[in-house]
Amino acid sequence: INNWVRVPPCDQVCSRTNPEKDECCRAHGHAFHATCSGGMQCYRR
């Protein structure tokens, strides 16, 4: 099972700090950020 989900609106924070990336994921209803390879990927809750 893939627990990552693409969150395109968070792509713009990929160059920022990890806490900012986590916050963007949370703002979109996810747990925290996984990776920005190919765009923001957040872990599902």
From Swiss-Prot:
Record's subunit section: Monomer.
Cysteines joined through disulfide linkages: 10-24, 14-36, 25-42
Keyword entries, A-Z: Antibiotic, Antimicrobial, Disulfide bond, Fungicide, Immunity, Innate immunity, Secreted
Gene Ontology CC annotations of this record: extracellular region
Protein name, UniProt field: Psychimicin
InterPro entries associated with the record: Diapausin_sf (IPR038203)
Tissues expressing the protein: Hemolymph.
Family label: Belongs to the diapausin family.
